[in-house]
Amino acid sequence: MSRYRGPRLKIIRRLGELPGLTRKTPKLKPDYINKSTPNKKVSQYCIRLEEKQKLRFHHGLAEQQLLKYVRIARRAKGSTGQVLLQLLEMRLDNIIFRLGMAPTIPGARQLVNHKHILVNNRAINVPSYRCKPKDIITTRDRPESRARITKNYEFSQTYKIPNHLTLHSLQSVGLVNKIVDRESIDLNINELLVVEYYSRKA
């Protein structure tokens, strides 16, 4: 299954707020609200599927990409669910998003693909690059790169930077302080249900 490129608000209506996908809030029409069936029993499979979809769409991953991360998390020490979230949160595209250098993760991925971003003074054009503590994220020293990042800062200046990151916006410099912990991940998701969904596949 490829990465989703369709209407983002359609996904938000179905799954709820996903800041990595879009910052827009859909207006629910009365007829859409009336379609809900609160008395209908939802299967455990559907509940697990929905949590998996939240994680996939928030990070903008294809199904096989997410499955790959689940398999890596299973081989690591510690809680599989928390390791999975850490792997995704430490991706370069997500770090750029969390620093406010891009309004969404797809926007951050575009910055990386077009080589607007440096990691430790090296141009990195791989969105899945795994950031490490003490990594320094900067904007490439060219007018187009600086203009795009500055515009994004203005858009996202009200967003709170998580404590595993530090941002010096005037210099367009971000610092990775440590591996992210669960409390710093601003995403309403039950990662254990995601792991359970993949229990027979990973």
Swiss-Prot record:
Complexes and interactors: Part of the 30S ribosomal subunit. Contacts protein S5. The interaction surface between S4 and S5 is involved in control of translational fidelity.
Upper taxonomic lineage: Eukaryota, Viridiplantae, Streptophyta, Embryophyta, Tracheophyta
Record-linked InterPro entries: Ribosomal_uS4 (IPR022801), Ribosomal_uS4_bac-type (IPR005709), Ribosomal_uS4_CS (IPR018079), Ribosomal_uS4_N (IPR001912), S4_RNA-bd (IPR002942), S4_RNA-bd_sf (IPR036986)
Name used for this protein in its record: Small ribosomal subunit protein uS4c
Naturally occurring in which organism (per UniProt): Huperzia lucidula
HAMAP family assigned to the protein according to its UniProt record, in alphabetical order: Ribosomal_uS4_B
Coarse class of the protein's main subcellular location: plastid
Task of the protein: One of the primary rRNA binding proteins, it binds directly to 16S rRNA where it nucleates assembly of the body of the 30S subunit. With S5 and S12 plays an important role in translational accuracy.
Locations listed in the record: Plastid, Chloroplast
Database matches in CDD domains: S4
Gene, per the UniProt record: rps4
GO biological process: one example: translation
GO CC, any one term: small ribosomal subunit
